[in-house]
């Protein structure tokens, strides 16, 4: 990422600290953010997974009984701004957030900020060789078809693919 670089990257990473709280996030990197790291693009996951990313109300007793070190991630906003890449607006989502089309649709509320590309980052290793790996790819394909937008999908297991606006 030199100062004149035309390279961009989205990286899935937990961000935050003990005092403020942690978020399951996507960080957007570019030459501009290298020069001013405080201006780094950040998407914080909105639709958190029960027990994996937050403890549902009324179930703290279960975590205490199991003596498991589980904590809560902080939820991000529903209508997060996109990551600007040249003349494109990339809308990240994390893991199974692409299952919730009505939540993704909220990102189209402002036509000036509406995504032109969707990007999904997922840690699917905990599924093993289960059907969920293939199901998640099919969900991403349907979202591309639904919104008529391409999707960039990066996973540590499963399918890392580029899906066109027709879901192919």
Task: Label the model's feature ranges.
Residues 1-168:
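Enzyme catalytic cores with a strong preference for nitrogen-chemistry domains
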